[in-house]
């Protein structure tokens, strides 16, 4: 249960109890009322700005109104005390019995604690990675892969119907270049000397194997075919090989998509899908024949002052109208974007999320314009931009050679430090802030390494369970037994840990609403810190140890608390896509 939603309802009920009404009649606007943890934990358990938000509407001084609301809240059986602070903040401190009951709810829900129905009935498409199938994934793809994957997991946990999607850019000019590059490697595999790879082709050694496989399958037959026919075969085989490599890289990172959508699908049957999408926009009045003003600055060599088929995107929020067709009659890449969005919308998605690199910032307004035009404003579109990742080793930048074909791959990073450190650390900054990734720091065993610190807390929980087996003979811990004596948890440090656990449902919902999966990583670090602190208190004070051999009921209660910590760590790490270890190796 979200305790803040619970007390939001209780606080609003007091408005009826004190007959709180707007001075000018009508209904109170309660939308700006916030109920949240106080910024300073010493101020209490729950804080609200209700009096300050409502004072003008009811015609009363904020502090006086706060005092009225506070007096009504004192009648709540779960409230220990209520204070008015500053200009009219109301701070509530709750009784230990309330936290003990909440802990029992958490224990009974297990790893489902925090699961929400926030997104019930809402279908969301999260598109991420969508790297061009022209080579292995490099480290630059890594952040978007993790952000998109964890966001999708988070939304699922919050009750949304989520589809993870990868858009395969397999219809552009870069694929033609790729096919010619592989054709060269195919000839090389047949024994021909190809010399230096010509400028403009893909030079990577990863294409050598594709050429060898083609030589093994076709022998010299491709050389005997018309070039266009041979290149079509090479293109198909190469895309399959590149996507197999990309899927393997993603699998190593524990990233798994539900749908792989080929751009070529939009172009079948003479691009019928694109033509239909443009026809729909035309019927809505969003397409016209016209000329675009010349671009600012020096004109490109291929600039043509000509009449074009244009999307009237400035009327739906874009900076300029966008061409839908090229001078040769083929469709622009943007026309494909329009069609792909329409396809998603026709599949029943209420919301589409695009996770893109920061270099795609110029796409945001045009995609938002497409969403408004195609769905008549009914669908929500969000673009999350991921800033660059800078690689370091022991504080020194990792130098990547600019020589063509050499770069650090995603697989290089995962193989060196492991999947979990990569996933966790890619979330340890908000996606729109640059991120430094130090190979040494993410593998050190210290508090300064967030993923180690969180996973170590999980392992410590299980070490407590093993101690319970050794010292109390409790091999199979029973949740009913553990929850039967929570009234014994009265130490302030124990209650503080319960408070931190109680924040989890609110954290899940707020991270889902704001589409900020990094909040989960921060919360898990804070929870781990609280648990480690409680462990250390037990090391310093025998009365606070989790296992008290001479007090089995208290031991069971504390084991129940540890179990809930373990459940929440497991839940959060699962959403992140990392393991919750039972011991550290």
From Swiss-Prot:
InterPro entries: aa-tRNA-synth_I_CS, Arg-tRNA-ligase, Arg-tRNA-synth_N, Arg-tRNA-synth_N_sf, ArgRS_core, DALR_anticod-bd, Rossmann-like_a/b/a_fold, tRNAsynth_Ia_anticodon-bd. Its EC number is 6.1.1.19. It catalyses: tRNA(Arg) + L-arginine + ATP = L-arginyl-tRNA(Arg) + AMP + diphosphate. One of its GO terms (biological process) is arginyl-tRNA aminoacylation. It is found in: Cytoplasm. This is Arginine--tRNA ligase. The gene is argS. Coiled coil: none annotated. A motif ('HIGH' region) lies at residues 131-141. Monomer. It comes from the Bacteria. Pfam families: Arg_tRNA_synt_N, DALR_1, tRNA-synt_1d. GO terms for cellular component: cytoplasm. Belongs to the class-I aminoacyl-tRNA synthetase family. GO terms for molecular function: arginine-tRNA ligase activity; ATP binding. Its main location: cytoplasm. Keywords: Aminoacyl-tRNA synthetase, ATP-binding, Cytoplasm, Ligase, Nucleotide-binding, Protein biosynthesis.
């Amino acid at each position: 249960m979200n305790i803040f939603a619970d007390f939001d309802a209780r606080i609003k009920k007091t408005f009826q109890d004190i007959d709180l009404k707007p001075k000018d009649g009508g209904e109170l606007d309660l939308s700006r009322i916030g109920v949240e943890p106080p910024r300073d934990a010493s101020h209490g358990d729950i804080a609200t700005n209700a009096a300050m938000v409502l004072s003008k509407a009811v015609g009363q001084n904020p502090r006086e109104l706060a005092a009225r609301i506070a007096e009504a809240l004192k009648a709540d059986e779960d409230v220990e005390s209520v204070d008015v602070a500053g200009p009219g903040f109301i701070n509530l401190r709750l009784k230990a019995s309330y936290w003990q009951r909440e802990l029992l709810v958490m224990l009974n829900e297990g790893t489902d604690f925090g699961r929400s129905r926030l997104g019930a009935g809402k279908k969301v498409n999260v598109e991420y990675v969508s790297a061009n199938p022209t080579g292995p994934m490099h480290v630059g793809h890594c952040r978007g892969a993790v952000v998109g994957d964890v966001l999708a997991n988070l939304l699922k946990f919050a009750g949304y119907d989520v589809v993870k999607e990868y858009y395969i850019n397999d219809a552009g000019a870069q694929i033609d270049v790729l096919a010619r590059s592989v054709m060269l490697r195919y000839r090389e595999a047949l024994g021909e000397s190809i010399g230096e790879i010509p400028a403009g082709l893909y030079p990577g050694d990863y294409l050598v194997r594709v050429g060898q496989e083609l030589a093994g399958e076709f022998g010299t037959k491709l050389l005997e075919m018309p070039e266009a026919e041979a290149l079509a075969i090479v293109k198909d085989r190469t895309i399959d090989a590149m996507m197999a490599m990309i899927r393997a890289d993603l699998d190593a990172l524990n990233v798994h998509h539900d749908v792989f959508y080929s751009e070529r699908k939009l172009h079948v049957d003479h691009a019928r899908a694109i033509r239909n999408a443009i026809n729909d926009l035309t019927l809505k009045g969003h397409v016209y024949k016209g000329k675009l003003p010349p671009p600012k600055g020096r004109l490109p060599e291929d600039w043509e002052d000509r009449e074009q088929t244009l999307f009237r995107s400035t009327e739906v929020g874009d900076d300029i109208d966008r061409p839908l067709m090229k001078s040769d009659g083929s469709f622009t890449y943007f026309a494909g974007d329009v069609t792909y969005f329409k396809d998603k919308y026709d599949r029943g998605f209420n919301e589409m999320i695009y996770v893109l690199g920061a270099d795609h910032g110029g796409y945001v307004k045009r995609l938002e314009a497409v969403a408004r035009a195609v769905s008549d404003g009914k669908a929500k579109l969000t673009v999350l931009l991921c800033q660059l990742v800078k690689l370091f080793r022991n504080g020194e930048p990792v130098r990547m050679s600019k020589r063509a074909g050499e770069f650090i791959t995603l697989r290089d990073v995962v193989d060196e430090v492991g999947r979990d450190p990569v996933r966790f650390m890619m979330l340890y900054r908000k996606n729109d802030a640059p991120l430094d990734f130090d190979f040494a720091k993410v593998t050190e065993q210290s508090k300064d390494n967030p993923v180690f610190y969180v996973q170590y807390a999980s392992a410590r929980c299980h070490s407590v369970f093993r101690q319970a087996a050794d010292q109390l003979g409790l091999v199979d811990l029973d949740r009913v037994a553990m929850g039967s004596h929570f009234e014994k948890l009265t130490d302030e440090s124990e209650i503080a840990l319960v408070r931190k656990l109680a924040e989890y449902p609110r954290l899940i919902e707020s991270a889902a609403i704001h589409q900020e999966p990094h909040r989960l990583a921060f919360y898990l670090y804070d929870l781990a810190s609280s648990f480690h602190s409680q462990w250390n208190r037990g090391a310093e004070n025998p009365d606070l140890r989790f296992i008290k051999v001479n007090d089995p009921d208290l031991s069971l209660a504390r084991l129940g608390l540890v179990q809930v910590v373990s459940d929440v760590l497991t839940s959060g790490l699962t959403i992140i896509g990392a393991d919750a270890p039972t011991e550290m190796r």
